[in-house]
Amino acid sequence: LGELAAAGAAVDDGDDMSRLYIRQGCYELTPSGTFSDPGPLAAYQASRPFLEYHLRRRVADLATVTILDHREVTEPLMTADTVTGARIINQTRAVTSTLDADLVVDTTGRASRTHAFLESHGYGPIPHDRTPATWGYSSQLLRIPPGRINERMAFINQGNSAPGVVLMAYEHDTWMLAISRPVKSGGPPKNFTEMLETAHRILPQAISSALHDATPIGNIASSRATAGRWRRYDHMPHLPHGMLVLGDALCTLNPLYGQGMTVAGLQVLALRNCLQEGDFDIVRRFYSAAAKHIAPVWKMNHVNDRPADPNPRLPVRLRNGIQRAALRAATHNIIVTERLLRVRGLIDPPQRLQDPTLLIEILATTLRNPRRKTARSIG
């Protein structure tokens, strides 16, 4: 992390709420004070190419790692009930060879074909859970003169029927502007002008005014690929030894929530722990461990993406009421804000929002402060 900072990544130490602008629904999370444990909330913000360059360099320096460039895996290799390696092709010389392995890990993301490979070898279809693509988004890399924006990030989520905005500082005075919009409201903005119009309507004037001085870098990127898919390898009664999938190849989340790399990192830690315990039944143990990390995030996203029920049942009304009370309290109380950010950042599990001491804090804050809405949803 120190190397990323030294190379120019934007750093927020997590100890100053003035560096963040967060609006959830109609509530601005702008309490005064400092977090009790700012370290886990520190953010090192950089573009994906910047991050991947530095990660690859660090990994390549490891004595136990060899990177084979310009190779493509064409298919895994099997004997009996075990994957023993992969067939690869050298793209520069068009030469095919085999690479033996005790464990093959598929991290090819959304394009993974492991499920099709397993089905073609008689293991049956892999069951999966899905959430629909109800959003689209557009993003644009910008260069903004230093000092024009005090915050390092602005995040606005107005709910599932109004546009959302993320503006995030990157390395070397570059910023990423992303605008999300429900498909039923027209989908992602089609050009930078449309993005700016939406941003100016939603962002605070002190932030949006800086966008007048922004210089676009490259073209906007638009996507409607916001569906979620969790391939339930953990539900399979039988799988071959020696092969597993990880990251988006296992579970693709709605990218608007910004959880993909964190959940993939948690899966890597789960795999490390499984390997440290030995290779016996490693595939099944890994999928079971990974599911424990994925399940609460998947459930939380499913609830957030679900259309509002006009006649919710009592448990749903209670949950929604607690969520609104927590957000309202977070506009005043740094303790509540810290807990919300820790859960959103997957540092703490969602169950921490049901902690009795937190509920008491929310109640006390609500009683001390009159109900007020600080902003309204803007279409």
Where are these regions (language model features)?
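Primarily hydrophobic membrane-targeting regions of prokaryotic envelope proteins
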Residues: 53-60, 72, 106, 118, ...
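FAD/FMN-dependent oxidoreductases across multiple families
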Residues: 185-293
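Short beta-strand to alpha-helix junction loop
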Residues: 38-57, 107, 113, 189-190
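Predominantly flavin-linked oxidoreductase catalytic cores and closely associated redox partners
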Residues: 61-203
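Helix-loop-beta segment of a Rossmann-like dinucleotide-binding subdomain
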Residues: 29-48, 85, 179-183
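Short, conserved secondary-structure transition motifs
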Residues: 137-145, 221-222, 290, 296
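C-terminal helical "tail/cap" subdomain of flavin- and related membrane-associated enzymes
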Residues: 272-379
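N-terminal FAD cofactor-binding segment of flavoenzymes
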Residues: 1-27
